[in-house]
Amino acid sequence: MSQDYKTTLHLPATDFPMRGDLPKREPAILERWERDDFYAQLRAHAKGRPLFLLHDGPPYANGQIHLGHAVNKILKDIIIKSKHLDGFDAPYIPGWDCHGLPIEIAIEKKYGKVGVTLDAVQFRQKCREYAAEQIQLQRRDFKRLGVIGDWDAPYKTLDFRFEADEIRALAKIVDKGHLIRGTKPVHWCFDCGSALAEAEIEYTDKTSPMVDVAYPALDPSALAAVFNATLPPDVQLAVPIWTTTPWTLPASLAISVGPTLDYVLVEGPTHSGQRRWLILAEALAAKALARYGIAELLIHGSAKGAAMEQHILAHPFYPDRTIPLLLGNHVSAEDGTGAVHTAPGHGQEDHQVFQQYGLLNRYSAAELNPVDARGVYLSTTPPLGELTLAGLHIWKANPLIVDALRLRGVLLAAAEMHHSYPHCWRHKTPIVFRATPQWFISMEQAALRSAALKAITHVTWYPQWGQARILSMIENRPDWTISRQRTWGVPIPLFVHRHSGAPHPRSAALMRQIADRVEQQGVDIWYSLDQTELLGTEADQYEKITDILDVWFDSGITHEAVLLERGLPKPADLYLEGADQHRGWFQSSLLTGVAMDNAAPYKQCLTHGFTVDQHGRKMSKSLGNGIEPQDIIKTLGADILRLWIASTDYSNEMSLSQEILKRTTDAYRRIRNTTRFLLGNLHGFDPTLHLVPLSDMIALDRWIVHRAFELQQTIKAAYTRYDFAEIIQKILNFCSVDLGSLYLDVTKDRLYTMHENAPGRRSAQTAMYHLTAAFVRWIAPILSFTADELWSYLPGDHADNVLFTTWYDGLAPLPPNAPLTAADFDKLLTLRDHVTKVLEPMRANGVIGAALEAEITVAADADTAARWQPLTEELRFLFITGDVTVTPANTDGFFVSAQATTKAKCARCWHYRADIGAHPTHPELCGRCITNVDGPGEQRHWF
């Protein structure tokens, strides 16, 4: 080439870096956000707009944030930012859950239990200090994720004002008649030394003893007569029960049978040389006898369970205790024997049966529940023969009780069972049901259950199955145990009568007075309060309750203590948490909201799945498959983590591995490279001077703006329904297909070779400006750091931050009367695909190198040919080939053929043209390039 024409080309130029270098670049952006008070500015720009309120469920203030925390906070942040772009004012007030056992345990490890080195006041102060330290650590990590919010004024359940508002919320619930006191079996953790809520329980596999125990009939002949059978004088009769909790047998006070179940009187194994008949559910008889070593089913009679009611049995090892046969609808024929040993102090259904029969008052508290808070039998527990139970832990007692039953001849079968069993979520140890005096929010007393079920149907659930799940939970849940026997928490400030145990008749009013004091001095004031100040002459008749509130009550009333307190409306638009919160925060918030206001505190509930590795396994240190968010940020950047979260179907388990992160990084690179190319081609473009009206744009440029408009509508709708994976998929497809494989490739010729101010070049730049201005908004909620950086390179005057704007309004659909309609482009792009397919074998066989070396002939039906012939001169630019000829033919549709060109290659544009060499000034250039270099410039209309 005799002359260097590179200087006559307008190649891309931008300072926007090719490499994201996110771990280094993101902290600088964060510093600027902090310095400029970005969140306050965002709220100021949104002032006066409609409000969208996403209420933050508080994480627990203990330990570093993990991947699940990151997923939750980033999903919320994506929604908050998208709502700002959608024209809403979307405040975000983060919060922390600060009371409860994990913090108590942390302080106990350092200082010992209350009373060892610290009194209760000092202990609570250490808990408060510890929680504040943990909040600082977590707040730093949450901000590093790119999550914006009111981090300088979060809500904390340990704040005096919050604790006071929590007591006021409880007073409302008392006013509405939902609070009750009772001695009921509740989930109990021996390590906590306290009752547990449903949400504090997790199910883990456990191996338990499985025993069948015979309860002899006290009047065997009468019981046999129920089955229309005559009992021979030398035959014994017993009712076997099956249990996996032998330790509860000392508390066994009855046997329950199913009233409508069919029972049979069968021949059982001999006992002490005598025959013994057994009563078994007919559906379970053969299976039970097989456990007892009996192969043959010999039936002596049959009867319904209801016929056995009130017949009396003997306890298997307490001869003085009589055991009535009672009817219980909970008894099934699924497993066991069809007879259930009933210990009302250790089972909720057992307790209900005794309640129905009015039997609870016949027994002392120690008979109902012979186990103390640590899991040890009380000193009053009678021995089992020579086995002393008093002072023995129940888990140690299990095998000893089995041995004692065997010695007494009442053990019919014994084995081990591996099954799912409830454990304490904090200690990971097995829990039990244990009857203790507790405070409850009743599900029935003031019709809370039915009101909550109705409220659920007025909420929109994402995914939809969330509604059925929480409906089932509310339908079947017991009363909510809200009292805890611990130190660090909000007290239940009730005065109860010293003799009757009844709460003071002015309890709600007194609680509000106490709340006013707590707001000024904290919860310690309750414990130091001289009750004569509030009760006057009644003070001697009452005593204070020392229980504290369940931490799920703390977080469950944030709609009252945070939203109302900060002047925000109820219900919130959205609650968003992990799928486990159907039985946690969603449920506690629902119950308190309905109890106080007869309405759910949220309009929508969205749940996300848990994080797992690529094999679907839960991430854990023991498996070595855990990936911490801090490590991802340190090596790849927060935007990569945000992109993975957004691109994953969070309604199910969310898989993450190094390979998945690599694919996510590749996707990020595609987005970054696309935007960098757009910015590079906007070099020298000023939208105030060079923007071309949509109606004057080249047809292809107008079409890509149309495509961007369609995509923006799809993206906006997907943000509205929280489908972020669709957004990422659509954006990546747009980058690869519409832009990378088509538009950016086709427009290079115009952008590089035309005059700087040529209408065709400015048209392409205008389209690219519109694309970039829209694109940066599309990604801003997800790739917040990258969007912030990209925005700073966007030409022209604009707001300081992309989130101070709304969705881009410079896009528009193609009008129906456009010179080339959207339907026309669909056909042309189909034709382009056919051209590509025709050229592939030519390239593979060496007939051509680049597509520019091929000349194309399109034979089409008359109507199609007539539509395409005006475009003939410019179709080569759309196809990026040599000359294109369109001819009418007697065919349906069209047919494409190609041949290698014999023309010379232009040294500047690389097109093969017939007029190269015809111009002595520039013998190496085609006529088009000559007019672009020295002349008025070429004219384009279509491509």
Swiss-Prot record:
**Keyword terms of this UniProt record:** Aminoacyl-tRNA synthetase, ATP-binding, Cytoplasm, Ligase, Metal-binding, Nucleotide-binding, Protein biosynthesis, Zinc
Location relative to the cell: Cytoplasm
Its Enzyme Commission number(s) read 6.1.1.5
> Which CDD domains does this chain map to?
Anticodon_Ia_Ile_BEm
**Location of the motif 'KMSKS' region:** 618-622
List cellular component terms (GO). Answer: cytosol
Top-rank taxon: Bacteria
- Could you provide one GO biological process annotation from this protein's UniProt record? isoleucyl-tRNA aminoacylation
Position of sequence motif 'HIGH' region: 59-69
Pfam family name, one: zf-FPG_IleRS
Q: Which family does it belong to?
A: Belongs to the class-I aminoacyl-tRNA synthetase family. IleS type 1 subfamily.
Q: What is this protein called?
A: Isoleucine--tRNA ligase
